[in-house]
Structure formats: C-alpha cells, structure tokens
Amino acid sequence: MEIEKNYRINSLFEFYEPLLTNKQKAYIQLYYADDYSLGEIAAEFSVSRQAVYDNIKRTEKILEGYEAKLHLYHDFVERNHEVDAISDYIKQNYHGDTQLIKMIQQLVNLEADSE
C-alpha cells in the first residue's frame, strides 16, 4: 500500500508540479522522491516536524483535488493501457505490417514526449 501511495503521489506531482508553491514542491520532492524523513526536511528548512507533516498532507490533498478535477494522470494511464492493447493486437494479427507498427511506435513516442 505504501509503495502504491508513493508511486501515485510521485505521478501526480509530475503532472501538477507547476501548480504548487515552491515550498510544496520542495517538501513533496524531498519526502516522496528523495526519501527524506520528516525530521530531515524539518532540519533543512528550520521548521518543526509537525509543520512539514501538515504541509505534506495538505499538498497531497491538493494534488488529489487537481486530479479529481482535471484527470490528467487517469487519462494518461488509460491511454497507455489502450496503446498497449492495440500494440499487442497488432503484433499478434499484423506482425508483418511494418508501417502499422511504425505508426503505433510514433504514437507511443508522442505520449512519452508529452510527459
């Protein structure tokens, strides 16, 4: 469960980072991506552990709120599932069609570039 939460928060952070304040960005980056403890972050910013904890929890809610309204992460995951399903179908049924395979790869590359 904890790994899934970390993955989700990191993913939401990638999509919605520009909408956060510098302090929110720093705390989330250090806590989730860099695996700092609350105490380490508190020492870095000369604040209490409770202040860091409150800021991180508030930012998690903000990220989830953005996702609830904008669905960027959900839509990204759904598109990837669909592209994977199409790719698998093409490989099974049209494995000799190099043009079709190339077009799907271009679609995958477009999605990767937009991250």
From Swiss-Prot:
Protein name as annotated: UPF0122 protein lp_1634
Any single Pfam family the record assigns to this protein: UPF0122
Family affiliation: Belongs to the UPF0122 family.
Q: What does this protein do?
A: Might take part in the signal recognition particle (SRP) pathway. This is inferred from the conservation of its genetic proximity to ftsY/ffh. May be a regulatory protein.
Which NCBIfam families does this UniProt record tie to the protein? PRK00118.1-4, PRK00118.1-6, YlxM
